[in-house]
Design a protein with these regions (language model features):
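Glycine-rich N-terminal segment of FAD-binding domains in flavoprotein oxidoreductases
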Residues: 40-72
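A glycine- and small-aliphatic-rich helix-loop capping segment at beta-alpha/alpha-beta transitions
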Residues: 65-74, 97-98, 164-173
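Class I SAM-dependent methyltransferase SAM-binding "motif I" and its flanking Rossmann-like core
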Residues: 160-210
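Glycine-rich phosphate-binding loop
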Residues: 144-169
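C-terminal functional extensions of proteins
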Residues: 199-229
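N-terminal glycine-/serine-/threonine-rich phosphate-binding loop
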Residues: 1-51
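Ligand-binding beta-strand-loop-alpha-helix segment within the catalytic cores
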Residues: 2-15, 26, 73-150, 202
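Gly/Ser/Thr-rich loops at beta-strand to alpha-helix junctions
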Residues: 51-60, 155-158, 227-229
């Protein structure tokens, strides 16, 4: 029934805190503002900033890059842990130059757009690795936890590539860590429309994703919803 709620009904008794904004641009700007404010706060304290970051939504990144460059905000003590990446049928990262690669997207859209003297070192730009499934978990523990997890919500409710299962209890779902998955047909279809003009046959079948456990243990979680679902 939630599909048919108007704004007033949705805000009347939400199950989680909700903020309804004027348009998508306001959602993206709000995410970028919170990223910048948290980095500035942690920099002032002389502490590291650790974010879990998505490639979807991505509209926050141009705002973020502009603010970092204009305000000369150092990212030297900032860690970006990206949520996921596509894999080949051999369960390897897809090529970074592939237009679908999230690693390539972050390089093209974020890291190379920030002034070299401000951007974080490459070793602080983290992606889940199919050859080292505990790397993200170990890194988060070493860094003292995640300050904020930013993300979106997929067509079937997935966050990163974590999709709910009818055979799994909530506790089992929350216990999941970084792992390799086969991507659902719904997600492949939606992503093929958005990224490949509907070329479903060219969409990867596999991915690596951080787990709901890593997401749920962030000190804050911000999910930006900018589509019809």
């Amino acid at each position: 029934e939630y599909y048919y709620y108007n704004k007033e009904e949705l805000l009347k008794a939400p199950k989680i805190p909700l903020i309804v904004m004027e348009d998508n641009a306001a959602v993206f700007k709000s995410m970028a503002d919170e990223m910048v404010e948290e980095i500035k706060r942690k920099n002032a304290l002389g502490e590291n900033t650790v974010f879990i970051c998505p490639v979807g939504p991505v509209g926050q990144y141009p705002y973020f890059v502009d603010m970092v460059n204009e305000q000369n905000i150092s990212l030297k003590n900032v860690w970006f842990i990206n949520m996921d990446e596509y894999l080949t049928d051999d369960k390897e990262w897809i090529d970074k130059e592939d237009k679908l690669s999230f690693r390539g997207f972050m390089d093209r859209t974020v890291y190379t757009k920030i002034k070299p003297e401000l951007v974080m070192p490459e070793e602080q730009r983290i992606f889940p690795d199919p050859k080292n499934l505990t790397h993200i978990q170990d890194m988060i523990k070493k860094l003292g936890g995640v300050d904020i997890c930013f993300g979106g919500i997929g067509i079937n409710g997935h966050v990163a590539f974590n999709e709910a299962s009818d055979t799994m209890t909530p506790d089992e779902f929350l216990a999941q860590h970084t792992r390799v998955l086969e991507i659902s047909k719904e997600t492949r279809a939606v992503n093929s429309i958005g990224d490949l003009n509907g070329a479903l046959d060219d969409m990867p079948h596999y991915c690596i994703t951080i787990g709901i456990n890593e997401i749920a243990h962030a000190r804050k979680i911000r999910l930006g919803c900018f589509r019809d679902w």
